[in-house]
């Protein structure tokens, strides 16, 4: 197993501490919260005064979650809300968390746009080293360097919108990806392109 798993909380804390941080609130990932629990994001309103809404992924989920987030921002009432209650519990999935704790341990990890984050990833515990591909084959995956002019880090941090990035639709498109952010149809880059089907932007 080549373990490149990431940890959400350290990355969010690093994002908030970045000098160009300009985010008013967070839609928190429902698939992460399904394991860790909605309470894993409680630190956002309590420590940073930032609204946080755990959301699912259907259009209805997203519209409702965004409406709650906007309401919290407008009323200056930061709180943690969970609109994905059909999947996410406050405490998450105890059995899955116990398995993760048994097999994985936090480690320093590199995040695109945020750099190296202490505790930002997971490593396989020594007890399971026989299954760790990096140890078995004696290599350490190095993060790929961003190509010149790559805007992935800026967009991931919320410091720039993909629609205004000069490479979008030119050097950075589904058929000619200019960085990891354009490697999938999800997130801000996918929305900026219009789904990534190659037919142009939304």
Predicted regions: what they are:
Residues 196-202:
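Compositionally biased, low-complexity flexible segments
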Residues 2, 20-89:
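A conserved active-site cap/scaffold subdomain adjacent to cofactor or substrate pockets
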Residues 64-154:
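Internal helical hairpin/lid segments
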Residues 140-195:
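Cysteine-cluster motifs in flexible loop/terminal segments that predominantly coordinate metals
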Residues 16-25, 43-47, 144, 157-158, ...:
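Solvent-exposed alpha-helices and their adjacent loops that cap or buttress functional pockets
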Residues 12-13, 38-45, 60-71, 97-101, ...:
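Predominant activation on well-ordered alpha-helical scaffold segments within soluble catalytic domains
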Residues 4-17:
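Short, flexible loop segments at boundaries between secondary-structure elements
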Residues 4-7, 29-32, 56-57, 152-155, ...:
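Fold-independent oxyanion-binding glycine-rich loops
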């Amino acid at each position: 197993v080549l373990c490149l798993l990431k940890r959400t909380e350290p990355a969010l804390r690093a994002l908030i501490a970045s000098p160009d941080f300009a985010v008013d609130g967070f839609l928190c990932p429902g698939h992460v919260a399904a394991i860790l629990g909605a309470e894993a994001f409680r630190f956002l309103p309590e420590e940073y005064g930032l609204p946080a809404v755990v959301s699912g992924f259907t259009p209805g989920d997203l519209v409702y979650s965004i409406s709650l987030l906007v309401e919290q921002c407008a009323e200056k009432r930061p709180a943690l809300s969970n609109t994905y209650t059909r999947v996410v519990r406050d405490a998450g999935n105890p059995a899955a968390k116990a398995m993760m704790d048994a097999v994985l341990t936090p480690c320093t990890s590199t995040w695109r746009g945020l750099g190296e984050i202490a505790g930002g990833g997971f490593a396989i515990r020594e007890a399971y080293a026989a299954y760790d591909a990096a140890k078995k084959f004696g290599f350490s995956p190095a993060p790929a360097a961003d190509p010149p002019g790559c805007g992935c880090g800026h967009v991931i941090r919320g410091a720039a919108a993909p629609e205004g990035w000069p490479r979008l639709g030119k050097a950075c498109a589904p058929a000619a990806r200019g960085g990891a952010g354009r490697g999938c149809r999800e997130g801000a880059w996918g929305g900026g392109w219009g789904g990534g089907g190659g037919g142009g932007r939304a």
